[in-house]
Amino acid sequence: IRQRPILLMGPPGIGKTQIMQQIAEETGVGLVSYTLTHHTRQSALGLPVIVDRTAAGRQYRATEYTMSEIIASVYEQMEKTRLKTGILFLDEINCVSETLMPAILQMLQNKTFGVHALPEGWMIAAAGNPPRYNQSARSFDMATLDRVRGIDLGPSLAVWQDYAAAHGVHP
């Protein structure tokens, strides 16, 4: 069964990133976190390079792409931690530029950026803020929502009180 990416939506400061960190720690998997507003199409897909090729006995030149900075970071994390499974967490997913959105949709659907795939054993989680909290945020269309399992987060006084009591927080 193919795991659909998880999409956490909620106001700024609600703890979306901390939730992913806690899940990774408690399950013993790796975590690579990226804020997508800091990326361009090139850093997500990789940079073009010209390579020499041969086909049907003829030489020609073609364009290939270096590995995505994001995918490369996952492999670096795997090497550093020796963990073969993990979560690629894409934050502020609904604030990316229009030129990057097709690559993001490809990642959500196929677990690839360009021609480079997310390693087996890694899943995608993403987060965003509803547009009412961020002028740069946009609502997702149905094509995007069909690719993810959405979870809406909101503040809860009871949850905060339980957390505060467990961690010695008091006025």
Q: For the regions a protein language model found, what residue spans apply to each?
A:
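AAA+ P-loop NTPase catalytic core and its hallmark functional loops
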Residues: 1-171
